[in-house]
Design a protein with these regions (language model features):
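Metal-dependent enolase-superfamily TIM-barrel catalytic cores that perform enediolate-based chemistry
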Residues: 116-163
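Structured beta-strand/loop patches that form or line metal/cofactor-binding pockets in enzymes
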Residues: 1-38
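Short alpha-helix boundary/capping motifs
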Residues: 14, 88-89, 144
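Glycine-rich, aromatic-flanked loop segments that form ligand/cofactor-binding clefts
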Residues: 91-132
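Metal- or metallocofactor-binding catalytic centers and their adjacent structured scaffolds
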Residues: 26-102
């Protein structure tokens, strides 16, 4: 099995874009990862992924630890947030591909699950409504009672927490 394509998919989402990485193999197995950066570094993350992506073409994705190590060593003088974000996206794709090739969940490659359940929270709930009410089809909250209503909506939807 060899990596034969590395593609960045940018999905416009109103006021921002979401970036995903798609790594394909010659066997048809495809791995995906979110590489979105919300702190203004998206162009740098994308550039780093493209640079690293060229160097992994033809490599066996199941050798994910060696690939990661080689990429990290090649970037050791510019280690930091952008580089690590790019490396993490590639690593996630290679883990996804490897798990699919063995017909196991990714956690099986990482010494098993660390928990049986994962609590979810409603992320960016009120922040999105304050900053981008029109884009999400909501009214901008302005009073404490508006935020109380949002809290009730979060609870009524089944979430136990919001951010």
């Amino acid at each position: 099995m060899k990596i034969d394509n590395v593609e960045i998919i940018t999905c416009p989402a109103g006021w921002r874009a979401w970036d995903f990485l798609r790594v394909s193999t010659d066997t048809g197995i495809v791995g995906f990862s979110d590489i979105t950066d919300s702190n203004g570094a998206a162009p740098a993350v994308i550039a780093a992924v493209k640079m690293f992506g060229e160097s992994i073409l033809g490599r066996d994705p199941r050798q994910y630890e060696q690939v990661y190590s080689d990429l990290y060593r090649s970037s050791r003088q510019s280690a930091g947030g952008v580089v690590h974000k790019a490396l993490a996206g590639i690593d996630n794709c290679l883990l996804d591909i490897t798990a699919q090739s063995f017909d196991v969940p990714v956690y099986a490659l990482l010494n098993g699950p660390s928990r049986d359940t994962v609590d979810l929270y409603w992320s960016h709930c009120a922040t999105t409504r304050v900053r981008h009410a029109a884009e999400v089809g909501q009214t901008r909250p302005t009073a404490l009672t508006d935020f109380e209503s949002i809290g009730k909506e979060v609870s009524d939807t089944g979430y136990r927490a919001a951010k």
